């Protein structure tokens, strides 16, 4: 757990001075002025316990910690921050929601606020303040956090996931770039396998990567878990086609993907064993920062997700919303901190620190410096705009959030691709589970 002081803030802020963003004393002075004029005044003696997902990019974590320290220095709020793996964030947030204690704020994944809508502090005032000031929210991000007209949380950012590939392997396979249709993408993966430079995508319980690529395939074929009225429609010809396509694709993969979590493909790619996968920008950053992997970094490129038979993007990107529990003793401090995070003086520096790992959800940040700092970052600037909400065409809410958290779509594909079940049984299992959720 990190307990932040002004000393750690001033000491740590110098690293980003070269970006032109406010740092050091200048940022502290701005933060203090912001706190005095903020619509939300932190309660006297406020102390916030904040859980966040464990960082994949060190510079992002550093920029976040500097922001936390600035908030503490400016408002006097004691900030205790700790990190958990992607897989552990939702269970630990659920424990806090059920017990009414342990956390004030939880920064999690996908539709986390929708899992316990009656346990969160409504954020309409924060959402309106930020939206009006910074050009409005991207559609999928807003939908992720809303129940009707109620904002259950704030979509801080999107962890964009796109195709990460070795250019040399693609070219050796006879392709100049990643094909932007499903048929061509399958041909590429077959050619990569033939050259012993395989692709690999997780079929295990990888909260970010597995949900992302398997929903992309399902939606790209026109298959969905539920329709616009939340009627379960997973048992369809479109789902059949999606499963068959995925099975063919999985036969080209590197061994072991059935047990992969969210860090497995990072490790395999950086070890030189994997040549195409879906991931955030973290693989490229890790290679770029390691002098021993200079050649790997230069050979690593990114591409948009190919478009499926329905002819339009069907991306499930990893929204990372933050929520405040309604049992917090410090609601004003909670709202103030969330608003503080997304102010330009903080947010653009934070995005630069994240180096493309985080994508903005407020339209004004389309011009943030991070997107032109490195040409390989640019693809990730599109993540919040090309995404569908995690509910697909259904209603975002607790039921859709439960289906994501329980890996129903992931397990359906994994059951068929690994041979644990045939096609019909794989769908039937998912259908039964969905009907229990949506009854």
Residue ranges: model-predicted function:
Residues 1-20:
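N-terminal secretory signal peptides and thylakoid transit peptides that target proteins
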Residues 39-45, 124-139, 203-205, 222-242, ...:
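Short, solvent-exposed loop/beta-turn-alpha elements that line the ligand-binding surface or hinge
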Residues 36-42, 109-162, 180, 186, ...:
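Hinge/lid segment of periplasmic solute-binding proteins
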